[in-house]
Amino acid sequence: RAILRKPIDRIGYGGYLKLALQFPEFVDYVESVCNEFRQLYENIKGTTPYCVKRVAVLNCWGKMRAWGCHMVHHALYYKQNYSYAGVIEMLSGAPFEVKFISFEDIKNDPALLDELDVIINVGDADTAHTGGIWWEDADITSAIRRFVWNGGGFIGVGEPSGHPYQGHILQLASVLGVEEENGFTLNYDKYNWEEHPDHFILQDADQPMDFGEGKKNIYALEGTEILVQRNKEVQMAAHDFGKGRAVYISGVPYSFANSRTLYRAILWSAH
């Protein structure tokens, strides 16, 4: 689906070209694949595919690592990574206009958020994937909060906005409606554990959500709708923030079912 939405014009070949001469069937196959790509180009004629919403993946690299921000060594499986890489895989073939923006982009031009419907922040806390120390910048946090409060959507996967600062682990805890327990709030009463399996995001799910490695010690704040919790650890939640909406998901390995759920999460958050 990704190739149909935006045809590629390069096929990577690793190895010595002279070795390919020893395998004429391989050369013939490459020729046939090239012809398939040419046919796609001819049929699509450079048109822009239909896009339901405008989505931006927010990390420290922005456009510099577009589509490759969770890919390690030819996208090989890694236990620490696959629960996040699925988000990028899903976006590549989904009917969205996808951009990759950095925190520096927002710092330099907060108005760029006005051109978006949903922001996605994916990864572990204090990494370039989620932002780390950038979350101490009040200009950036206020711009993102304002974006959601005025009607934008925010999808957080893993430990979004994760950076210990001013008494919070998740700097957008009030937006996401969830926080991570690290021992500092053990004595806080936590009453919100009721699940809402009939929520719009899960309405057509025909199997339980696969969160991959998931996350431990995530709890919901008051007013948050928990979609899935396991052993009193929130795996998926939805939260209204002003006119906007936010969704928290602990992990999204790639699968058809997970893609559908993330698709519905984006639509719900953008409403």
Regions found by a protein language model. Give the residues of each.
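Short, solvent-exposed loop/turn segments at secondary-structure junctions
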Residues: 17-19, 61-64, 105-106, 125-127, ...
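Mature N-terminal, pre-catalytic/accessory segment of carbohydrate-active enzymes
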Residues: 44-54, 58, 87-91, 111-114, ...
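Short acidic/histidine-rich motifs immediately flanking catalytic phosphotransfer sites
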Residues: 111-123
